[in-house]
Swiss-Prot record:
GO cellular component assignments: cytosol
Record's subcellular location: Cytoplasm
Positions that bind S-adenosyl-L-methionine: 93, 98, 143-144, 161
Enzyme class, UniProt record, top EC level: transferase
Keyword vocabulary terms for this entry: Cytoplasm, Methyltransferase, rRNA processing, S-adenosyl-L-methionine, Transferase
Record keyword Methyltransferase present: yes
Transmembrane segment boundaries: none
Name under which the protein is recorded: Ribosomal RNA small subunit methyltransferase G
EC code(s) of this entry: 2.1.1.-
Protein family according to the UniProt entry: Belongs to the methyltransferase superfamily. RNA methyltransferase RsmG family.
Gene Ontology terms, MF aspect: rRNA (guanine-N7-)-methyltransferase activity
Superkingdom as given in the UniProt entry: Bacteria
Record organism: Mycobacterium leprae (strain Br4923)
Length: 248
């Protein structure tokens, strides 16, 4: 899906010193250019903001400064392989903007909404979006709140990274998706155990066709594992209103 666009020399890429992470330099060179192309300068500015303001405000730990490219930006942006042109994407529990902002940088055709409940994170996200000049909406709220769906509409894709277990992610994501929309959850090495543990709850919430896919296998030393599932055509649950109580 990505096209390599040569926007500078090898030496110019080397000037982006924070690119050098746990991956081999040649691998980073290929991955960065393949994913970000002519928007590499925007990605670098985002990395700088994460390394400074993001860490200062506690959105990331200080030990993350030397692995922002491989662990965070590339890890997030490769999910774009699974997205269609013009997809309407919601990043649930966006935090410091991961994976939503790397996706928006790599794929400006996407319509990205960052959904985050905490004010300090929302403030950071809005500052970053303004600084980078991105066409991205930041919404302060929780996925389970009814007004959130009214605000952002039905999305094609709900993405998340290190937010919650699959049962909760499914509960939060389904109401924000159009029928047939996709949930893309970046997960770790215990992904199959997690699916086995939560598959019945996921199905009861309307998730169908649960599968595990790998992104970035051609150019990342550690490809990214993603749980992909769809919102069923018939079973769709609306989020609860804030303050509503169940009646017996």
């Amino acid at each position: 899906m990505f096209h390599v666009k040569h926007v500078g020399s090898y030496e110019e890429l080397a000037s982006f010193t924070s690119v050098k992470g746990n991956l081999g330099f040649d691998t980073v060179f290929e991955a960065v250019f393949m994913i970000f192309g002519p928007r590499l300068n925007i990605a670098q500015r985002y990395v700088d903001l994460l390394a400074n303001t993001g860490i200062e405000r506690g959105l990331l730990g200080p030990h993350e400064a030397n692995r922002l490219w491989d662990r965070h930006l590339l890890n997030s942006a490769v999910v774009a392989e699974l997205l269609d042109p013009g997809d309407r994407v919601v990043d649930i529990g966006s935090g410091a903007g991961l994976p939503g902002l790397p996706l928006a940088i790599a794929r400006p055709d996407l319509q990205v909404v960052l959904l985050e409940p905490l004010l300090r994170r929302v403030t950071f996200l809005r500052e970053v979006v303004a600084e980078l000049g991105l066409d991205v909406e930041v919404v302060r709220g929780r996925a389970e709140e009814l007004w959130v769906r009214d605000r952002i509409g039905e999305r094609d894709v709900a993405v998340s990274r290190a937010v919650a277990a699959l049962d909760k992610l499914t509960k939060w994501s389904i109401p924000l998706l159009r029928p047939g929309g996709q949930i893309l959850a970046i997960k770790g090495e215990h992904v199959f155990d997690e699916i086995h543990q939560h598959r019945r709850v996921m199905a009861s919430l309307g998730a169908v066709d649960v599968m595990v896919v790998v992104c970035g296998a051609n150019y990342l030393c550690r490809p990214v594992t993603v749980v992909l599932t769809r919102c069923g055509q018939q079973m769709r649950h609306k989020p609860a209103r804030v303050g509503d109580r169940k009646t017996q």
